[in-house]
């Protein structure tokens, strides 16, 4: 129940943040607003003390690989408080379709340079406590981002 409420809260916050981001910074949100897209909300749970390493990997490497594979980020968030604020990273990516998402993730995961980065980032211990969770979202007819 707590996890479900957290996800609902995060999804609501992300939609609101997307709206605000679209008003303040039209790129890449405007691109993501193209009709027919599907949105993927990914939640990463880091091992205790490893959230800074996960964020560094995203900041320093992952975003570049996303760009390489035409994966546009909408935004990244961590919970504002509570125990999950120390271990959780949430972000949203738009995709033209689920099939495109699957193809992009396959290319991303198979990239030898990404594999080196992922391995190097974990020399001091495994970063993730579990596999990332992925939820695909369809925009509502009244959503400012579609």
Which residue ranges define each predicted feature?
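Short acidic-aromatic low-complexity motifs
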Residues: 45-51, 97
């Amino acid at each position: 129940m707590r996890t479900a409420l957290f996800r609902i809260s995060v999804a609501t916050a992300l939609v609101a943040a997307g709206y605000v981001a679209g008003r303040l910074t039209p790129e890449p949100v405007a691109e993501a607003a193209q009709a027919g897209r599907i949105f993927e909300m990914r939640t990463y749970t880091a091992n205790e003390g490893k959230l800074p390493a996960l964020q560094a990997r995203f900041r320093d490497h992952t975003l570049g690989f996303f760009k390489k594979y035409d994966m546009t980020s909408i935004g990244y968030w961590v919970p504002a408080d509570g125990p999950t604020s120390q271990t959780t990273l949430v972000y949203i990516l738009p995709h033209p379709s689920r099939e495109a998402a699957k193809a992009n993730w396959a290319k991303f995961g198979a990239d030898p340079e990404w594999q080196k980065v992922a391995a190097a980032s974990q020399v001091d211990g495994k970063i993730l406590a579990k596999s990332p969770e992925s939820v695909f979202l369809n925009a509502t007819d009244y959503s400012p981002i579609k």
